[in-house]
Amino acid sequence: MTTKTMKPLVEPHRLNRIWGRRAVIGVPMAFLLLVFLVPFLVVFKISVSEMDGVSFRDVVTWAEGAIHFHIKFDNYLGLAQDALYFQTYLSSLGFAALTTSICLLLAYPFAYFLARSPADKRPALLMLVMLPFWTSFLLRVYAWKMLLADAGVFNTLAMAAGLIAEPIKMMNTPFSMVLGMVYTYLPFMILPLYSNLVKMDLRLLEAALDLGATPWQAFWRITVPLSRSGIAAGSMLVFIPCVGEFVIPELLGGPETLMIGRVLWDEFFSNNDWPMAATVAVVMVLLIIVPMALFSKSRAEARA
């Protein structure tokens, strides 16, 4: 009589592979939860806390054998009733959307040219894109302050050439702020687009041309749809930091440039109203989650 050896339901090496994959994914996810979710929860706790002198009252306390909650949503109600905050959020979203649109219009042609350039020239062109990151962000923004001032380089050259009779006010305007943000975040739009376009199968374009499509039709019907994931990734990388930008509006913007980052700074350090500042920050994060959710949905549809 013979006996058959039963195989295990999951082979050991496959089981090790599964647990190894989970560990590789789980460790970064745990780190992200630690450095992003925990600070957000702390900020949310401050937003619903009561001030007790110079400190915050505990949200949850234990007294007389019972749990007591000390949660206040007055700051959220005050924020919803104050038109200034509403205008600031709209202004921040509008400037961020405008900056993202301009970056996309400027970055797409350059990324397309970069992807279609000879392979031996691409590293040099990519280095030009990355070159601004070799210097301090603050110095780069402050350089625009020198260029756009009334006695700056642009006005001086224009007056010397006889193009204008007196300096044009460019500093402390929405124009100067948007210009600074476009300059700062343009590489964040170029790189995802290039990464997407360089992997495109050019045989699809050749097939479209062979079937009678014009180059313009092939571009709009093949190249642009296939680069949607790059457009979405670049747009998120530009839009999200622009919404909460503080340094550029502070250095280049003026009183007409309402940005939520400046309001946060004033609430925290000028008014010393940490609960209200935390409330503004929480609402800003929730507003940013919406485009991120749309981006995730577009990525899922692209993979499908």
Residue ranges and their predicted role:
Residues 37-83, 151-152, 254-255, 304:
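Short membrane-interfacial helix/loop motifs at transmembrane-helix boundaries
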Residues 3-8, 12, 194-209, 275-304:
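C-terminal transmembrane helix and the adjacent membrane-cytosol boundary/short C-terminal tail
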Residues 37-48, 105-109, 138-142, 155, ...:
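Membrane-embedded alpha-helices of multi-pass transport/permease systems
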Residues 27, 127, 131, 183, ...:
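Transmembrane alpha-helices
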Residues 246-272:
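Glycine-rich helix-loop "coupling/hinge" segments at transmembrane-helix boundaries
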